[in-house]
């Protein structure tokens, strides 16, 4: 879990401290939940302003606050230009302290299921940090990154979006080493214009990979050629049921789940999944 002095956070965020240079552990954005020892970020939105709730954050255990203007509170504060952007900056700073495989997953459908299954598989080799609930946006992802600790061997991060540039921003915080796009479908079309726009937005994840990263591409999706183009600078592993792919499978489902024979260059394996659906 994130742990540092307030002065270190201020240096990262180019902020100004008022009050004591305290040590904090973890970050919080919600005064309705416990925040023992945490740095509270006073976020603002159309219908709320976290700056009005510093006393509530303090009662929940927060020891300091990140604010966009000085507040009348005994809590030490670090003043930044934009608390929402600062939340992301601090999350990225903390993520860079860990040299572990980071799997980022997005897509119109199935990303939560794929994230949960990936976490389950990797947990057999060591502790895997994973996105909790729906914390897959520009607030939730930094909160997830802040939970990284020395005991984590992997991170599995879900990313959601409803407009262009959002996945690019999230990937810029997480620095994934492996990127997975499950598919592109007609979800949130109002934010992307059309299905091509959805596919390009999801493909921002591949474009953000470093040259030594791995893009995992669904060859059954009509936009696989576009994603291959966006991932042309890195390693690609493709998968599919209906096309020739590096990882392919035979699938048979019933009301109780699915029987799958998975084929790879290293051999085959048969698994029974207690999940309906293809």
Regions inferred by a protein language model and the residue ranges of each:
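N-terminal leader/targeting and accessory segments in enzymes
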Residues: 1-89, 93, 270
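Conserved beta-strand scaffold positions in the cores of enzyme catalytic domains, especially
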Residues: 17, 77-79, 102, 127-130, ...
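Short, charged/polar "capping" segments at the starts of alpha-helices
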Residues: 70-74, 221-226, 246
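Phosphate-binding loop of NTP-binding sites
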Residues: 87-219, 225-232, 264
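Adenine nucleotide phosphate-binding catalytic loops in nucleotide-utilizing enzymes
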Residues: 195-199, 234-278
